[in-house]
Amino acid sequence: MLFEHYNEIPLGGWPYRYFKPNEVACQGTGKILVNEDALAALDNLRSHLGHSINLSSAYRSPYHNSKIGGAPRSSHLQGHAFDVRLQGRDKEVIRKVAEQVGFKGFGMRYQTFIHIDMGRRRTW
């Protein structure tokens, strides 16, 4: 479900424990696409890791994705991709746990974050 701004989500209508709507909303517009499977997997990832997760990117509106030079068919546009800041954490541990909770796509080539998504199985 798409909301024009994350503050439109009804009180009590957010079932996710570890992430607030503003953390997974588009950073450029405040829009939020609630992808229930992806958000549940993200919550499970946080629970299984046992430490906080900070996101550098989650849902992106088409406008914001274009503005920042994102891929035209980015998984961020469907609300099922997240860029997880490493902050000294082991990238491979995050990848393994993310795979266990249902993520299939992994962008490992970045220095400061790991990209995880619910798309097709692949690693780059």
PLM features: what roles do these ranges have?
Residues 18-22, 46-52, 79-83:
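Generic detector of short, locally flexible boundary/turn motifs and exposed helical patches
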Residues 10-11, 68, 100-105:
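Intrinsically disordered, low-complexity segments enriched in small/polar residues
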Residues 1-46, 111, 120-123:
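Extracytoplasmic cell-surface/polysaccharide-interacting catalytic and binding patches
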Residues 73-124:
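Catalytic cores and adjacent binding grooves of peptidoglycan-active enzymes
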Residues 37-69:
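Extended, low-complexity, intrinsically disordered C-terminal regulatory tails
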Residues 5, 48-51, 64, 76, ...:
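Histidine (H) residue identity feature
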Residues 26-28, 53-59, 86-90:
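N-terminal start-of-chain detector that recognizes signal peptides
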